[in-house]
Each structure stands twice: as C-alpha cells, then as structure tokens.
C-alpha cells in the first residue's frame, strides 16, 4: 500500500516518464492502483475529507479537538466551542461481507444512531470500511450495528478506533510493504 503521486510540469513528457517508471517498477513488483485503493487507505488511517464535515461539525465531533487552543484569548467560534460536547463522534466501521453506502444511517435494532460519511472495500482487511459519525459519542469502538450496503442489502458491522491499523505509520514510512491479496470488488 506504499504509493507515490508524481506531479509534472506541462513541458514534461508525462507519457514517456510514466512508461519509464512503469518499466523499472515492474522489476520490483510495482502495481498500478487508483482511487479505490487510496480511498481505502484514507479511511483506514482516519483521514477526513469533504464528506466527513458539514456546517454543524465541530473539531471535537471529528476527533480533532486537541488542535483547538481554548486557552487563546479570543477567536471566531470560541463561544460555540466552549458550549460544544468535547467527545469525538467519528469512528471507523468494519462491514462484514459488503460495503456500506455513503449517507446511510447506522442502526441498532430500530434505533438510528449514526451516519456513514465515506466507505469502500479494504483489500488489506478484506471487508468494507467506513468513516462514520455517531449521534451518541458513547456508541463507539466495539459497538455492533447494522448498515445498508451499496447493493441494498443489510450488513452487520462493528465500530472501531481510528486509525484502523498501522497507528505507528509504518506503511507511510515504507517500513511495511506487504501487498494484500484479498478480493477487490471494484474490478
């Protein structure tokens, strides 16, 4: 899952450079990937993007409260943040046998308790993975839930902490270069 992105100037021959990198990389087991793999890694790492935020999301909701300097004398939004719940409501979710559909609610029995912010298949974990926002911060890691998948079926899932694995960042630093061989349903 170690990967690189290359940014070139307009005057560079991107096709020629890409072919050269590909030829050399094949000798070392390089494979081409795309958006689904990067989406999986982003979700597994707990990196949030546009679908994880809306106008009501506080830094605390997103698990980013440690970046808020409440001891600063004054800043825009301070009063609202002082009143806000300081607990994180953002967690990971592993879906057994399917991929949760983004925007769907998460439930326990008849109770709707959260929302899927983003999701995909994880070839590394061999299950669907998602970033979710819970209504109640107490419904966190190890909570077993139900969610609707991209195929319309209902799946069992379990909430988990973020990052989902590699909390030491070994993959990003190139210290873990294991390539998963699990199923890849986006092919």
Question: Model-flagged regions — what are they?
Answer:
Residues 1-187:
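Conserved, structured C-terminal
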